[in-house]
Amino acid sequence: MANNVMDSSFKKEVLESDLPVLVDFWAEWCGPCKMLTPIIDEISKELQGKVKVLKMNIDENPNTPSEYGIRSIPTIMLFKNGEQKDTKIGLQQKNSLLDWINKSI
């Protein structure tokens, strides 16, 4: 299961991570976000030890999404070595996400 990350812990949990980090930006009121949750949780289990998977609620943590220009959700960002590597916007299929992650890391 993916852990939550907050504005206050984003730098430590994401930018300073030794592992690549996948961040799912979401909101409680977002239907596609809710549909993506089980997919993100499965990916978190499958890639445990290879990729850190985190979720950020944009309503509770407005600063980080604003810094990264997030205008639509769900938005999934992949970070590696403290830098944003790639972004996917909208509901994604599990296999498509896994392929994307594996190519990006």
Swiss-Prot record:
GO terms for cellular component: cytoplasm. The keyword Electron transport applies. Keywords: Disulfide bond, Electron transport, Redox-active center, Transport. GO terms for molecular function: protein-disulfide reductase activity. It holds the Pfam family Thioredoxin. Residues 1-105 form the Thioredoxin domain. Disulfide bonds join 30-33. Belongs to the thioredoxin family. Component of the thioredoxin-thioredoxin reductase system. Participates in various redox reactions through the reversible oxidation of its active center dithiol to a disulfide and catalyzes dithiol-disulfide exchange reactions. This is Thioredoxin. It comes from Rickettsia conorii (strain ATCC VR-613 / Malish 7). The lineage of its organism: Bacteria, Pseudomonadati, Pseudomonadota, Alphaproteobacteria, Rickettsiales.
